[in-house]
Amino acid sequence: MATLFLYSNTFSFFFITLVSLALLILRQPSRAASCTARPVIFNFGDSNSDTGGLVAGLGYPIGFPNGRLFFRRSTGRLSDGRLLIDFLCQSLNTSLLRPYLDSLGRTRFQNGANFAIAGSPTLPKNVPFSLNIQVKQFSHFKSRSLELASSSNSLKGMFISNNGFKNALYMIDIGQNDIARSFARGNSYSQTVKLIPQIITEIKSSIKRLYDEGGRRFWIHNTGPLGCLPQKLSMVKSKDLDQHGCLVSYNSAATLFNQGLDHMCEELRTELRDATIIYIDIYAIKYSLIANSNQYGFKSPLMACCGYGGTPYNYNVKITCGHKGSNVCEEGSRFISWDGIHYTETANAIVAMKVLSMHYSKPPTPFHFFCRR
């Protein structure tokens, strides 16, 4: 695998900023101290928050250089390091979420489980690993955990209790694949946006099912700017670009989806009055990274660090990151996009910092709200 895009200004303002970010995200005793109960998190989603489920469930090869930074090895994450969900867990001083499908090791999922699988959509609902299937997996997980916890006094405390499930945080980050696949099938913009109400309905139904299982605290991420992904830009011959070089139609569809998701959260706050529903504007955060990339020390914000093809996007669907012939940049910290679809650890760290700031949550809520008693 070749290496390209060398940069020498290692001690730039960006790296000073990055150190500050690390301190903010990973060393926040005030946040951790606010958790008076053990944090329990259940996550549902796609590759943006998959911490190894695709590899564990299907044996799909996600090899090096994925994971080359923090983990120093591939862990099944589609990034050079940590994902947003990893930084959020670390902000609470809790261990990183293990994939539900990863049965190896001695984990008992005491701090929750991750049901997210790369490539997962909301529709069709009965195809692995759609959101519907992930919620069914959770139902089985909960039932089995409570069964084991009640089977022996010696096992009490080793598994999540009924109160643990009730007080847990339920995170959902899904919908991107539904929109992207519609465009990939050749559907027009109008055909794609007609699917959005169905997608929103399925997400709402899944949240209500989790509520029926006892969940009361929900953390909902909207989708990012699809039209700014190097993968989409490299495959679509279009002059329909905005001032930052992103595809207007893709981003417009994502924006309409996000508006529907926001409205859904408003409805759920009325329908489920004893539940807390937090909506996070991930789109605004990620688009700001691209629009203000120089301020964050990024170069070529629409170019993948790992891929093939060089400028302007370094993405080729036939030679993707980690495959024979692909290249990888030396300093991923100068790139927003890792592989043309997913973000670098550096970009994820900045996204996490902004999520934790409460400026992008509706209503403004600290991430640790669910583990305060």
UniProtKB/Swiss-Prot annotation:
Matches recorded under CDD domains: SGNH_plant_lipase_like
Primary location class: secreted
Localization per record: Secreted
Leading EC class: hydrolase
Keyword RNA-binding in annotation: no
GO molecular function terms noted in the UniProt entry: hydrolase activity, acting on ester bonds
Disulfide bonds: none
Protein name per the record: GDSL esterase/lipase LIP-4
Name of a matching Pfam family: Lipase_GDSL
GO BP annotations, alphabetical order: lipid catabolic process
Similarity annotation: Belongs to the 'GDSL' lipolytic enzyme family.
Domain of life: Eukaryota
Record key words, sorted: Glycoprotein, Hydrolase, Lipid degradation, Lipid metabolism, Secreted, Signal
Active site: 47 (nucleophile), 339, 342
Residues bearing glycans: 93
Segment forming the signal sequence: 1-32
Keyword field contains Heme: no
